Regions:
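Short, well-ordered secondary-structure micro-motifs within conserved domains or adaptor modules
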Residues: 34-64, 205-209
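Leloir-type glycosyltransferase catalytic cores
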Residues: 3, 83-122, 234-279
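N-terminal pre-catalytic "stem/leader" segment of glycosyltransferase-like enzymes
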Residues: 1-46, 50, 133, 275-279
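Active-site donor-nucleotide binding/catalytic segment of nucleotide-sugar enzymes
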Residues: 115-171, 264-266, 270
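Well-ordered, non-membrane alpha-helical segments in soluble/globular domains
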Residues: 14-21, 52-58, 140-152
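Short loop/turn segments at strand-loop or loop-helix junctions that form parts
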Residues: 6-8, 45-47, 73-77, 121-133, ...
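Short hydrophobic beta-strand element within catalytic cores of glycosyltransferases
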Residues: 223-226
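Donor nucleotide-activated moiety binding/catalytic core segment of transferases
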Residues: 34-36, 144, 151-154, 159-162, ...
């Protein structure tokens, strides 16, 4: 099988991950070419159709229209700068990361640990994401989504709300339209596209459509409300009407499976994520 690595449209931090993937691919007996459509499996960096990665959108859509799978690499959220997402046709729950029902081996290897559910938090966090991402397609403008979300929350509770925009997708002034809603400006975390750099000790819940803040919140013991494409969906709350009494399920199996969505550079070079994807 021939993999086409689109390195020219990768993020600046993507070079070592592409290099590791090439080693992993060839170790399994497959072949590699660069920046070409003449391949069985295109490999792109991220599904953020913006900046230097914008051309990946055409590559992705053309391949999918042709019935080809697309291998997507992306910054990880479990161990920043250490683990990297490797999935087919996406980076969230729409993607194929291999079989579910996994054991705890990778959770233990990565040193992941579920924190107890936080039942004493007071603040509702709404975490935005980049609206130029494939993850946000078919969604309303980010500003409308935030306004609708706050309006829905206010039908149930007057709790303090903190709105945190994605560091690369700013929205101004939204918080001024409501009482007890404030903005918390995230600092961009080096080598990531997420904004989960805050202390969740006072968090009652986190609302996030389909990006990293929801999965990180769950690990830290904070209930989440997400869309169906979120990797947090299996253990997330689905309806904001229950925000005063959020669901706090067992997260053990969920974390076991989540650990198989991200891999270290060494593991990628050994072909382990490809083996898990049954290549």
């Amino acid at each position: 099988m021939k993999f086409g690595l689109w390195t020219q449209y990768g993020a600046l931090n993507s070079k070592p991950i592409f290099a590791a993937l090439e080693k992993g691919i060839t170790s399994l007996g497959h072949t590699v070419d660069y920046n070409t459509d003449d391949c069985d499996i295109p490999v792109i960096w991220s599904v953020l159709w913006n900046g230097r990665m914008a051309p990946n959108e055409k590559i992705f859509k053309t391949a999918r229209d042709q019935g080809k799978d697309v291998l997507v690499l992306e910054v990880g959220g479990l161990k920043r700068g250490t683990t990297w997402k490797v999935g087919l046709n996406g980076i969230n729950r729409e993607a194929n990361f291999g079989p579910d029902g996994n054991g705890p081996e990778r959770v233990q290897k990565l040193g992941l640990e579920l924190q107890r559910w936080n039942t004493f938090g007071e603040t509702i966090y709404i975490c935005g994401q980049h609206d130029k991402s494939h993850q946000w397609r078919n969604m309303p403008p980010m500003s409308q989504w935030v306004l609708d979300t706050i309006t829905t929350i206010r039908r149930t509770t007057s709790r303090k709300i903190i709105w945190r925009p994605h560091p690369r997708c700013q929205l101004s002034g939204i918080e001024h339209e409501f009482q007890n809603v404030i903005r918390q400006q995230p600092n961009k975390i080096k080598n990531t596209y997420d904004d989960f750099d805050f202390d969740t000790d006072d968090a009652w819940c986190v609302i996030n459509w389909s990006s990293n803040p929801a999965t990180q919140a769950l690990i830290e013991g904070v209930p989440v409300f997400t869309g169906p494409e979120s990797l947090a969906w299996p253990v997330a709350n689905k309806d904001l009407s229950t925000i005063s009494l959020p669901f706090r399920p067992d997260r053990t199996q969920w974390l076991n499976d989540l650990a198989y969505t991200e891999w270290t550079i060494e593991e990628i070079s050994e072909g382990l994520p490809l083996k898990h994807l049954t290549f």
